[in-house]
Amino acid sequence: MGDMRLVVAGAAGRMGRVLVQIVQQTPGAMVSGALARADSPAIGQDAGVLAGCGEIGVKISTDPLRAVADCDGVLDFTSPASTMVLATLAAQARVVHVIGTTGLSPEHLARLDAAARHAVIVQSGNMSLGVNLLAALVEKAARTLGPEFDIEIAEMHHRAKVDAPSGTALLLGEAAAKGRNIDLPSHSLRARDGHTGARPEGAIGFASLRGGGVVGEHKVYFAGAGERLELAHVAEDRSIFARGAVKAALWGRGRKSGLYSMADVLGLGDKI
């Protein structure tokens, strides 16, 4: 089996350029295609040159059908609309689809579940080892500490991030909800303003900060009477997400079709 041919979607963006770099540095993987929006000034440029790793002979295009038809996997940190298009194409081509796109709605997730009948999909709000380990710890803490400890999740990202709470914050919220054996949507508290009254019992609160060039910071608070536990993760470089995504793609190659998470890739299931 030769190198895994990977298409980088959103190759002209910050995350896309890092993905190109990491794929080219990873043994057993290569960039076979690079996609960008039709209005991108990067169309026609060599993806490696744009990413700062030298010419790789792959020009950035706007044709996902052609790119996906000639690859083994897709690395997708784009938008929900683009992810849905790529999910359909990846399912048709039976290739691995690694999704780091955030802001996905329940309808989007249902469509991914359907696409996963025909392809390997690895979807996560965060691809880093540290965050996924944090999620496992949050689940255990929520289960162990019990409802007398209030759960609050705070996150901060760069000023250009368009969705809130972040996908990682929601990943951590889902982990906390699982630990408490509750449903996150019906217990999620995302806005406080004015006279809010007392904190709802059993709520999982979210606070989102935006500013500067912050890659990503997350902290989960378990606040009890007389004591507080804080679990945190700080991302200092986008390469941690790219390395996780490439690891997920290589892990998914040859695997049975289905919808997987980074916890599956990292084998975190029942180890904590």
UniProtKB/Swiss-Prot annotation:
NCBIfam families: dapB. NADP(+) binds at residue 37. Its EC number is 1.17.1.8. It is an enzyme of class 1 (oxidoreductase). Catalyzes the conversion of 4-hydroxy-tetrahydrodipicolinate (HTPA) to tetrahydrodipicolinate. (S)-2,3,4,5-tetrahydrodipicolinate binds at residues 158, 167-168. It is found in: Cytoplasm. SUPFAM superfamilies: Glyceraldehyde-3-phosphate dehydrogenase-like, C-terminal domain (SSF55347), NAD(P)-binding Rossmann-fold domains (SSF51735). The active site is at residues 157, 161. GO terms for molecular function: 4-hydroxy-tetrahydrodipicolinate reductase; NAD binding; NADP binding; oxidoreductase activity, acting on CH or CH2 groups, NAD or NADP as acceptor. It comes from the Bacteria. Its main location: cytoplasm. Keywords: Amino-acid biosynthesis, Cytoplasm, Diaminopimelate biosynthesis, Lysine biosynthesis, NAD, NADP, Oxidoreductase. GO terms for cellular component: cytosol. This is 4-hydroxy-tetrahydrodipicolinate reductase. NAD(+) binds at residues 10-15, 100-102, 124-127. One of its GO terms (biological process) is diaminopimelate biosynthetic process. It catalyses: (S)-2,3,4,5-tetrahydrodipicolinate + NAD(+) + H2O = (2S,4S)-4-hydroxy-2,3,4,5-tetrahydrodipicolinate + NADH + H(+); (S)-2,3,4,5-tetrahydrodipicolinate + NADP(+) + H2O = (2S,4S)-4-hydroxy-2,3,4,5-tetrahydrodipicolinate + NADPH + H(+). The keyword Magnesium does not apply. PANTHER family: 4-HYDROXY-TETRAHYDRODIPICOLINATE REDUCTASE 1, CHLOROPLASTIC-RELATED (PTHR20836:SF0), DIHYDRODIPICOLINATE REDUCTASE (PTHR20836). Pathway: Amino-acid biosynthesis; L-lysine biosynthesis via DAP pathway; (S)-tetrahydrodipicolinate from L-aspartate: step 4/4. Belongs to the DapB family.
